[in-house]
């Protein structure tokens, strides 16, 4: 069976020794082929005139986590294996970020990611929120959006519920959130708002 992530790309190199002969490049995308950046990369690599150009082009791709490249001796064949970075959220519709907070350009080709918006200085707070909220077994709390504002602080939105953490993320708030989620699991009732900003407890709103 043909690997759907394996691309065979016939290239024409313009060096004098290979003029008029096809140069075959096989690229295996370990993480799949789903980004516009990958398509642009394929178009660009067709224009490469040497092995150095190929390697420089790969090194310039911020979405590539790691790669290996092998040239077949005495033949016009190159084998490239590429592992993509795996984004988990998009910041202000400008950049992808993976779990290690590596940044790479957002190309609007992948939509099923957490959209994060706001003037955020410490992106570790975003990872902390994702880990806390999605640690629950309730599928209703799969995050769609995380918003930060100077007025409201951190708001996390799932399909049906808004979770409000306020301006400062504390261990007490996270503990209150976990205790509340455990309670909601027991009663099988999901509120429209979970507000953990209060010192004395958690406010639940079941309104539409």
Where in the sequence are the language-model features?
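Charged, solvent-exposed interaction patches on well-folded alpha/beta domains
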Residues: 1-208
């Amino acid at each position: 069976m043909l690997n759907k992530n394996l691309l065979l790309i016939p290239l024409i190199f313009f060096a004098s020794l290979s003029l008029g002969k096809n140069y075959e490049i096989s690229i295996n995308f370990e993480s799949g082929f789903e980004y516009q950046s990958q398509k642009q990369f394929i178009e660009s690599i067709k224009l490469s005139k040497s092995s150095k150009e190929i390697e420089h082009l790969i090194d310039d791709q911020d979405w590539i986590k790691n790669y290996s490249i092998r040239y077949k001796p005495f033949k016009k064949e190159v084998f490239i294996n590429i592992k993509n970075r795996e984004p988990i959220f998009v910041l202000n519709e400008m950049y992808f970020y993976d779990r290690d907070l590596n940044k790479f350009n957002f190309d609007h080709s992948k939509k099923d990611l957490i959209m994060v918006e706001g003037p955020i200085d410490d992106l570790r707070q975003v990872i902390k929120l994702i880990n806390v909220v999605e640690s629950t077994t309730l599928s209703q709390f799969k995050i769609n959006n995380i918003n930060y504002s100077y007025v409201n602080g951190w708001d996390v939105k799932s399909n049906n519920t808004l979770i409000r953490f306020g301006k400062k993320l504390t261990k007490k708030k996270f503990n209150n959130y976990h205790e509340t989620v455990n309670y909601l699991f027991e009663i099988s009732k999901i509120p429209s708002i979970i507000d953990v900003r209060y010192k004395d407890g958690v406010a639940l709103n079941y309104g539409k």
